[in-house]
Amino acid sequence: MPLALKIDVYDYQRFMPIENKNITFNHNFCESRLQDFKGPETWNAYTSLIISIVPFIYGFPTYPLLYNVACMLAVNGIASFHYHYFLNWFGKQGDEISMILANYFGLWGLINMSYKKSIKRNNINRFNTAFMYIFLVSNTIINNDYLFPSIFGVYIGGTLVMIYKVAKQYKIKYERNLGISFIGATGWIISEHYCNKYTKYGHPLWHLLFPLGFYKVILEFDKMKQSLNLHKKEDPIENV
């Protein structure tokens, strides 16, 4: 029996949002709120490209899992540009999926650095993979649009805990660079909660300071991983 599929949310031929009387999603960025929720968000869009440029300036990590994080960040800048410029569902998915995957690969790498090959490590990685998959699927449902910041906040919180754990374990200095990203995050939060013509620049500040700080943290952890490789012969599976 054939199925008739009705696409109410999105016109994939034009890559633009189409009207739906029952389902909508909000553009909760200060710059577009000041423009009656209309694009393009010029400042937000063009500063997003900084995220894509940073990996090419500082270089890509050697450890495959951290290399994947860098690749996702390079993709994220372009996807974020599309989202902020066109304010459509396609751009939103591209932006948020690359964020989820970047955190997934980063957390996977941190888990492997912190735990030796064991059943416990495998179980933690399984949980990370399951969480990522459920998050991706639920995020495609337009009614769940408002949940992304909260769920991603929990997910990134787990990564921050692992950054602290691994840094303490191997005596890696990360506080200064993570602090730079924190300043950018603070600017973004202020812009969304106290939106005006001045605070709207908090989001572009995030696009600048987040990659400058966080990417250096990635490179420091990659340097540590490579130094470990020089002192012991690792199983090739370790780097998968």
Which ranges hold each PLM region?
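Multi-pass alpha-helical transmembrane bundles in non-GPCR membrane proteins
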Residues: 2-240
